[in-house]
Amino acid sequence: MKKSKLSLLLVFSLVLSMFLAACSGGGDKDTGKGKTEGNKNAGKEEQLADEQVLNVLESAEIPTMDSVMAEDVMGFTMLNATNEGLYRLDADQKVIPGVADGMPTYNDDKTVLTIKLRQDAKWSNGDPVTAHDFVYSWQRAINPDTASPYGPYFMMGKIKNATEISEGKAKLEDLGIKALDDYTLEITLVRALPYIESYITFQLFYPQNQKFVEAQGADYAKDAAHLLYNGPFKMTKWDGPTATEWVLEKNETYTNAKDVTLTKINFNVSKDPQASANAFTAGETDITPKLAQAAILSQYEGSDELLRYQEPSIWWLKMNEKNPALKNKNIRKAIALSVDKKALVDDVLANGSIEADFLVPKGFAFLDGKDFRDTAGQWSKTNKEEAKKYWDKGLAELGVKEVAFTYVGQDTETAKTTDAFIKDQLEKNLPGLKLTIESVPFKIRIARENKYEYDLLMGGWGPDYADPMTYMDLWITGGEQQHMDYSNPEFDKLIKAASEDLVDKPQERWKALQDAEKILLEDDAAIAPLYQRSVNLLINPKVKGFAHHAFGADYSYQWIKITK
């Protein structure tokens, strides 16, 4: 993000406050006719309902509840509800202590953090949560044998010796996290990170009870019976990754259990937005999944049941360069320029989402009060004529007249509608292209992406911490989250500089990140950004204290109260 030569953390605090003001909406900024923040307010004078049970619909299953293996927002959100790390985000997006007993102390160059832990934090089986639980989980995340999808990506180049351990050149105990005693952690960084405090709120960094994990063996986290919890709620029902319903109940061993009012949350999966809206109207659910259908949303415009906010998540087309045709830059440029993004957001989504000709979202990152987007360019703007020229040139270079691609999409109704529009746009504007859509459950979509078993794929990304780098370093050569076989040494060089040499030179670092964005989107057309998403939920007005987050988990449920 932004740092000053005198004090990285001081400026980070200022930057984060600006980021939060832009992202959280602050209650005054309405991005639509629905209610943007009203359900966050507690309604101090309202009486509580006799039964504090919340019913929630979600649009996807939970692929895993193992915090070092989670790589999706459903997993992150459920982990956030049932567990707690050193720090968490509060309802106003501020970093607050979780298991930590206060904020970190730093050495002079901000590369060593010392964190005291609360001595009353407990696991749901009664065991104390100690510094050793954090050391174990962090080491497990970076251990090559674990094959964590996020561990190496998140830690390498940031936590001391993470890169060396991931590459088999150092031992696990060399990782830059030490238990000085049962309740004192020391974290050593490769270099100062201006966003370190928001960074370690992420679910990957949650503790794990080594004795329990190892006792479960291969069964660990396979269902609710093989999990421990140290957060606001515990799972009392979840049959594993294919389960379409699960139950959370208040965790009485949680440190701040006295502040948790809900006694139970019932979750069910609904992949049909109309069915979700019907269930809400019938009073069968209190909160729906994110809704995108204009026909549904139009019925609730102006209603206090509609919660709408712009989130810093970008959706794009990924292009797998293991396919020889997609290795061709002109073919990729043609695809990137051929989709009518305005029609997509206005006519298909029609939910407040905006066109994205960029990677780092609007209203997310600021330097000296200026939005990253205001000083960066806009890339891959829709241009069907140019797209056709690139397409013809690419086909000629490949020596073919037709190309067929497999497009892997999700099996929700919203995804199917969007995917059908993408197919129509590409086939209509790029003669000779045949696109076959395969709609699959979320877990399978992730698996196919990870195995490179796709040609085109609709992907998206929400930030994991408060800095543009959370979007940019995804695309470095060999990046753990890339799964496209993309590589550009100049891009890698700029990202490395922004991560290392320029960390205390905010203006130069900003320029490097913006130059890297241009290479990725304009020069190489490695991905095709489509839109920045607006979130629309239906939520019972009697539900107070519902909090949504700008990065990491989507929501927090622990502050919810149900009124009469």
Where are these regions (language model features)?
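N-terminal lobe/hinge region of extracytoplasmic solute-binding protein
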Residues: 57-108, 228
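Aromatic- and charge-enriched surface segment that lines or borders ligand/interaction sites
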Residues: 102-150, 186, 325
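Surface-exposed binding/hinge segments that line
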Residues: 116, 135, 149-211
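Alpha-helical secondary-structure segments
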Residues: 130-137, 182-188, 262-264, 282, ...
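Gly/Pro-rich hinge or "lid" segments in bacterial periplasmic/extracellular proteins
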Residues: 183, 189-259, 264, 274
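Ligand-site clamp/hinge motif
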Residues: 252-298
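Detector for C-terminal structural segments
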Residues: 338-368, 413-423, 448-564
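Structural transition elements
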Residues: 355-394, 414-416
